[in-house]
């Protein structure tokens, strides 16, 4: 299941293994299951990823519990996505593009009742990384009016995959240039 996620969504196996070691990701009936937790770490429900790439939740009415991961340090900002894959993709994009991002919590939610609203209202920055025309984005913005909306034309996971492919292409080109230069060296 982890290798499927690594291939299908270009998520690093190291990250998936880390999530698995904390029981935040596991296999259930050959499907990927992401744990929805409170900020205190109490497991409340699960996001189940089906073979078509759609998420369902086991207990959709759970309040103030979401799939989340955070970078180290005292949390200064939050990024809210519409599911665990999107949340992890944004984390990876930000780590790839900036080594100096503030300590951030990345949340994957299905509905606004899953948000730790009071906690989010106390943060310096909250980013809603959900398609702005979606019902969910509008509901989150109504709940957190000071939040910033950051939507994209495609999914965050698609953006992550494009970033990885560009990086691999650049690496391949650099290797070809290196091999060409090696061939030009005379060792007489």
Residue ranges and their predicted role:
Residues 39, 86, 133-135:
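Short, glycine-/Ser/Thr-/acidic-enriched flexible segments
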Residues 53-73, 78-81, 85-110, 117:
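Catalytic phosphate/metal-binding cores of nucleic-acid and nucleotide-processing enzymes, i.e., regions
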Residues 5, 92-188:
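TOPRIM fold recognition
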Residues 25-27, 81, 119:
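Sterically constrained small-residue positions within well-ordered secondary structures
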